[in-house]
Each structure stands twice: as structure tokens, then as C-alpha cells.
Amino acid sequence: MNKRKSCATYLYQDSLARRMKELGVSRSELATMTGLSPSTVLTACNGRPVSVRTIAKILEHLQVDSSEEDDFWGIDPV
């Protein structure tokens, strides 16, 4: 179970970092845009668990639409 959780964490961290780089958004800018605290954004960027609400805010502000969410999170469609 821990191995699987670690894999998902790295996929999320990599996807978030890639999207931020594509858009030219820093962690502090993301914190300002989302209204989240800088420490919460840092937690998300480090691949640690964050709430669904936090993930929704990040997705909204990084302009990830529902059609590309699976690719963003590294999820293979079933």
C-alpha cells in the first residue's frame, strides 16, 4: 500500500510541477491566485496529501479542464 501511495504522490508532484512550469507560475503566485496559504501550496508541490478542496482550487487556477484531468494526475483510463 505504501509503495502505491508513493507512486501516486510522485505522479501528482511531477504533474503539478510540469503544469506550473508550462504556465510560468511560481508557488507564491499560485498561492495568491488560489487564496491558499503558501505552506499549503508548498505541501501540494512536495506531493504530500492535501484536501480535495485544495486540489479543486489548484486545478481551477491551473486551467485544467475535466477532459485532461486524467492525464494531469497520471491516471490511466479504465
Positions of the model-derived regions?
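A short, Lys/Arg-rich alpha-helix, primarily the initiator
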Residues: 1-29
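Short, basic-rich loop-to-helix N-cap that marks the start of a DNA-contacting helix
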Residues: 43, 47-60
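DNA-binding alpha-helical recognition surfaces that contact promoter or target DNA
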Residues: 18, 32, 43, 57, ...
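Residues that mark the N-terminal boundary/hinge immediately upstream of a DNA-recognition element
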Residues: 15, 26, 51-54, 68
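Short C-terminal boundary/hinge segments that cap the last helix of small helical domains
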Residues: 63-78
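The DNA-recognition helices of helix-turn-helix-type DNA-binding domains
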Residues: 37, 48, 62, 76
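Short alpha-helical DNA-recognition segment
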Residues: 22-43
